[in-house]
């Protein structure tokens, strides 16, 4: 099991290769990354049999930017019939697993295999259980089968607590009909990814305040309002009337890059289409000057050297906070609902929750 297999957004295979190669070098795991363009997956081939396991144990998955999912294992050719026997034979040296996910890559060809996986899962699950290879125990490794076709599968393992929260890393979020735009799903997914679900009531509570920079028509504002927050929406464009009717939104016609609240707020969110360095500077200012406690900001990516640019900006932000002597947690992920962008989440670790009065 010396191969690490990773899912990603189609077109970002080289970014996954660059990122995982950097972490492998840091962990002294010898090997090389490879991928074909627009296949929605990449591999890291380790030189030593335990390389993939060491790489996964030494790196938190939720700190990776471009991979959506990862698993260590082997590629397996399958016959047209009796695929289960071949899979069971290959699993002789596998540990007992605590859960089973059947996955496909995020391409048109991959999606065509979804129905096959749905039909194949029940008999496979039954056979694995009867063979003593699958029980219901979240503490044990997760068994992941990624089908490239009906005749080829990647048979792998991952720690359920150190891999994607959803199969293929794709959340099943429902678009709320009352939301002004589909961009609302980006912020909802960001909260799922960056904030543990059991902390939502504390960190996304109705007695909080927020600012949405570049808010119109209100896709991200909607998520803040949905949690009961008082929101100051900053945009020269119009906001959805449905949001204004809630009485929770104050709309200010102003420039999102120059606006500052009179008093600190709990949350700042921003999805302005602008050069990534400029949006990154907003994070430095708002967190560094104590204008907010937490922030979610999207960084639009350049056409080339995308991982290198994101890494450069994150390093710059981190160094800036160190120079100020403040403690900030920094997360960054290309979410499923992101396109040519990544989503950053920052949280001040040394600032108390703000009071409720509306901030203007």
Q: Model regions: which residues?
A:
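SAM-dependent transferase fold signal centered on methyltransferase-like domains
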Residues: 1-360
């Amino acid at each position: 099991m010396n191969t690490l297999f990773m899912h990603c957004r189609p077109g970002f295979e080289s970014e996954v290769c660059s990122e995982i190669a950097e972490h492998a070098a840091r962990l002294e795991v010898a090997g090389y990354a490879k991928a074909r363009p627009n296949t929605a997956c990449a591999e890291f081939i380790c030189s030593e049999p335990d390389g993939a396991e060491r790489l996964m144990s030494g790196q938190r998955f939720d700190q990776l930017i471009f991979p959506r999912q990862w698993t260590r294992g082997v590629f397996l050719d399958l016959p047209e019939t009796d695929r289960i026997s071949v899979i069971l034979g290959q699993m002789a040296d596998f540990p007992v697993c605590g859960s089973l996910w059947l996955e496909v890559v995020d391409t048109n060809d991959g999606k065509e295999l979804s129905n096959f996986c749905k039909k194949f899962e029940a008999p496979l699950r039954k056979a694995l259980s009867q063979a003593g290879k699958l029980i219901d125990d979240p503490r044990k490794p997760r068994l992941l089968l990624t089908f490239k076709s009906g005749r080829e599968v990647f048979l792998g393992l991952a720690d359920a607590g150190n891999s994607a929260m959803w199969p293929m890393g794709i959340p099943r979020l429902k678009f709320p009909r009352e939301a002004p735009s589909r961009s609302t799903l980006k912020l909802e997914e960001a909260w799922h990814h960056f904030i543990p679900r059991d902390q939502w009531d504390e960190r996304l509570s109705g007695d909080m305040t927020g600012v949405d920079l570049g808010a119109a028509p209100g896709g991200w504002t909607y998520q803040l309002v949905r949690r009961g927050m008082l929101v100051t929406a900053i945009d020269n464009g119009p906001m959805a009337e449905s949001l204004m009717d809630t009485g929770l939104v104050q709309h200010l016609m102003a420039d999102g890059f120059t606006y500052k609240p009179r008093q600190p707020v709990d949350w700042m969110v921003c999805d302005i289409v602008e050069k990534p360095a400029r949006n990154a500077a907003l994070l430095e200012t708002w967190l560094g000057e104590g204008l907010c406690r937490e922030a979610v900001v999207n960084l639009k990516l350049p056409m080339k050297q995308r991982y290198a640019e994101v890494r450069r900006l994150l390093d710059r932000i981190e160094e800036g906070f160190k120079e100020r002597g403040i403690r900030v947690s920094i997360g960054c992920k290309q979410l499923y609902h992101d396109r040519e962008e990544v989503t950053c989440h920052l949280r001040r670790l040394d600032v108390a929750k703000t009071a409720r009065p509306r901030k203007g």
